[in-house]
Regions:
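Class I SAM-dependent methyltransferase Rossmann-like catalytic core
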Residues: 1-11, 25
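Conserved class I S-adenosyl-L-methionine
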Residues: 9-21
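Local beta-strand N-terminus motif with an aromatic residue
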Residues: 10, 102-104
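Conserved SAM-binding loop of SAM-dependent methyltransferases across substrates and taxa
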Residues: 20-38
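Conserved beta-strand positions in the Rossmann-like core of class I SAM-dependent methyltransferases
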Residues: 42
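C-terminal substrate-binding/active-site "lid" region of AdoMet-derived donor-dependent transferases
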Residues: 99, 112-190
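A conserved beta-strand element that flanks and buttresses the S-adenosyl-L-methionine
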Residues: 107
Length: 190
């Protein structure tokens, strides 16, 4: 992913699911080593505790001028941003959007059960020519009993993923790259 972003030189980046900052550290290192700094880098994280870690990482790499750490539930942030976009299209001054309304590169992480939903939420934020990166959710194996809550979440998440790929196949170019530990998926609007 780091290499792909190095080639893209994306000016506007959104990372969904910053966690404790492993991937963010790779990206900050890229910005530092390549001398390439994006216009804006939004890191969305559901938990405030992790946001503290991300803030420390941001200050260590001196990314305050271009980084926005956003804490909140993705569904709500997307809804608020779409409402902001509609309100600002009327010409009214409505402040800043919770997350940037368009990005050249979007990285979507999250649980296997939520990954398809998160990708679907973020696709409208993809700029023309932009790339959305995610990992394919784990595929369920064997029989899963209906009482197995975790197993059923995995099955339902994977089924939602298959439905998403089928529907996006009409509107996006989709590439799959098997890697150690999973399959990287890239989506570009047709």
């Amino acid at each position: 992913m780091r290499d792909a972003l190095a080639r893209l030189k994306a000016q506007r980046i959104i990372e969904v699911g910053g966690g404790i900052g492993h991937r963010s550290a790779w990206l900050y290192d890229l910005f530092t080593e390549d001398g390439f700094t994006p216009e804006r880098y939004d890191i969305i994280e559901n938990g405030a505790k992790f946001a503290v870690i991300l803030h420390r990482l941001m200050t260590r790499y001196e990314g305050e001028s271009y980084t926005k750490i956003v804490v909140g539930v993705l569904d709500a942030l997307v809804g608020e941003t779409l409402a902001w976009k509609a309100a600002s299209s009327t010409g009214l001054e409505v402040g800043d959007a919770p997350i940037q309304p368009e990005a050249d590169a979007i990285i979507v992480d999250g649980t296997n059960a939520q990954r398809a939903k998160n990708v679907e939420l973020m696709l409208p934020f993809l700029a023309p020519g932009g790339v959305l990166f995610t990992l394919e959710p784990d595929m369920p194996v064997g029989d899963v009993e209906p009482e197995d809550v975790d197993g059923m979440e995995l099955v339902n998440g994977f089924n939602a993923w298959i439905e998403l790929i089928q529907s996006c196949n009409e509107t996006h170019h989709i590439g799959f790259m098997p890697l150690f530990g999973g399959t990287l998926v890239a989506m570009v609007r047709k």
